[in-house]
Amino acid sequence: MMPGQIPDPSVTAGSLPGLGPLTGLPSSALTTEELKYADIRNIGAMIAPLHFLEVKLGKRPQPVKSELDEEEERRKRRREKNKVAAARCRNKKKERTEFLQRESERLELMNAELKTQIEELKLERQQLILMLNRHRPTCIVRTDSVRTPESEGNPLLEQLDKK
């Protein structure tokens, strides 16, 4: 029968090979009402041969107690290992965070000290320039051989230019 075709009412249970539960029915013609309930009526006939095999339908076979205990023990060990690994990971992360915090504080302190040192050096430079400018009018050294701080460039660049 093709999909979408209407079944022929004259079909008998015996004429259809392998209809599952209907195979135990007599091969006489069945009405549509009988066909509806044939599965339900013959379920007992289907289960009866399986009964001697001690097959329980709808239930899984229960594992042996020792298998359950072993499985439970494995789960406990796995959970315990996972718990220890998670604690180790949290501790490592905490230590790393603390290290980075200390390093950040150290670098901020160093940065502040360097900025202070820069300000002190700028102030010292200003004082030296002021002293030099005060001394210049009374200086007996030739002025064309002395450079003024304002006309000074970068001494490293000047040395490179000479080469």
Curated annotation (Swiss-Prot):
Keyword Transmembrane helix attached: no
Annotated GO MF terms: cAMP response element binding; chromatin binding; DNA binding; DNA-binding transcription factor activity; DNA-binding transcription factor activity, RNA polymerase II-specific; DNA-binding transcription repressor activity, RNA polymerase II-specific; double-stranded DNA binding; histone chaperone activity
Annotated stretches, region: Disordered: 1-20, 59-89
Taxonomy of the source species: Eukaryota, Metazoa, Chordata, Craniata, Vertebrata
Domain of life the protein comes from: Eukaryota
Record keywords, A-Z: DNA-binding, Isopeptide bond, Nucleus, Phosphoprotein, Repressor, Transcription, Transcription regulation, Ubl conjugation
Family: Belongs to the bZIP family. ATF subfamily.
Pfam families noted in UniProt: bZIP_1
Gene Ontology annotations for the cellular component aspect, listed alphabetically: nucleus; RNA polymerase II transcription regulator complex
Residues joined by cross-link Glycyl lysine isopeptide (Lys-Gly) (interchain with G-Cter in SUMO2): 65
Subcellular location: Nucleus
Region named Leucine-zipper: 100-128
Phosphothreonine PTM positions: 148
Region Basic motif, residue ranges: 74-96
Source organism of the structure: Rattus norvegicus
Function: Component of the AP-1 transcription factor that represses transactivation mediated by the Jun family of proteins. Involved in a variety of transcriptional responses associated with AP-1, such as UV-induced apoptosis, cell differentiation, tumorigenesis and antitumogeneris. Can also function as a repressor by recruiting histone deacetylase 3/HDAC3 to the promoter region of JUN. May control transcription via direct regulation of the modification of histones and the assembly of chromatin.
Subunit structure: Interacts with IRF2BP1. Forms homodimer or heterodimer with JUN, JUNB, JUND, CEBPG and ATF2 thereby inhibiting transactivation by JUN, ATF2 and CEBPG. Binds multiple DNA elements such as cAMP-response element (CRE) and TPA response element (TRE) either as homodimer or heterodimer.
Record has Phosphoprotein as a keyword: yes
Post-translational changes noted in the entry: Phosphorylation of Thr-148 by MAPK8 in response to different stress conditions such as, UV irradiation, oxidatives stress and anisomycin treatments.
GO terms (BP aspect): chromatin remodeling; fat cell differentiation; negative regulation of fat cell differentiation; negative regulation of transcription by RNA polymerase II; regulation of transcription by RNA polymerase II
Name of the molecule in the record: Jun dimerization protein 2
Every bZIP domain range: 72-135
